[in-house]
Swiss-Prot record:
Gene name for this UniProt entry: rbfA
Record's protein name: Ribosome-binding factor A
Compartment(s) of residence: Cytoplasm
Family the UniProt entry places it in: Belongs to the RbfA family.
Principal location class: cytoplasm
Record keywords, A-Z: Cytoplasm, Ribosome biogenesis
Organism annotation: Desulforapulum autotrophicum (strain ATCC 43914 / DSM 3382 / VKM B-1955 / HRM2) (Desulfobacterium autotrophicum)
Length: 119
């Protein structure tokens, strides 16, 4: 028996393919700073939720989202050719806000520590 479900193995492979594709083959400048942080796949392998992060502000995130939407067909064809599944999962790109929340928490902790030092 495999150590983890097929959906997790396929999700890991999709993440690997997408990361490589964005780094090397997609020439859209709107998504050059996009990082694929994780992929979650439904148990029936029909929908892949692709979580991405972008270095920059909200305008940069919106640009990256539009870039991913406009490149969706190219990305899906490339992933399908590399994946070799009977059915290619539908890719749904979602901005991963965990990095933003982590940065915000870090700033809050630093401000609290600075406040303690001044007292």
């Amino acid at each position: 028996m495999k150590p983890y479900p097929r959906s997790e193995r396929v999700a890991a492979r999709i993440q690997e393919i997408l990361s490589d594709l964005i780094k090397k083959k997609v020439q859209d400048p709107r998504i050059e700073l996009v990082t694929i942080s994780s992929v979650r796949l439904t148990s029936d392998l029909r929908i892949a939720y692709v979580y991405f992060s972008v270095f920059g502000d909200e305008a940069r995130v919106e640009e990256a989202t539009q870039g991913l939407k406009s490149s969706h067909g190219f990305i899906k064809r490339h992933v399908a050719s590399q994946l070799g599944l009977r059915y290619m999962p539908e890719l749904k790109f979602i901005h991963d806000q965990s990095f933003d929340r982590g940065t915000h928490m870090d700033q809050l902790l630093k401000s609290v520590l600075k406040g303690d030092d001044s007292e």
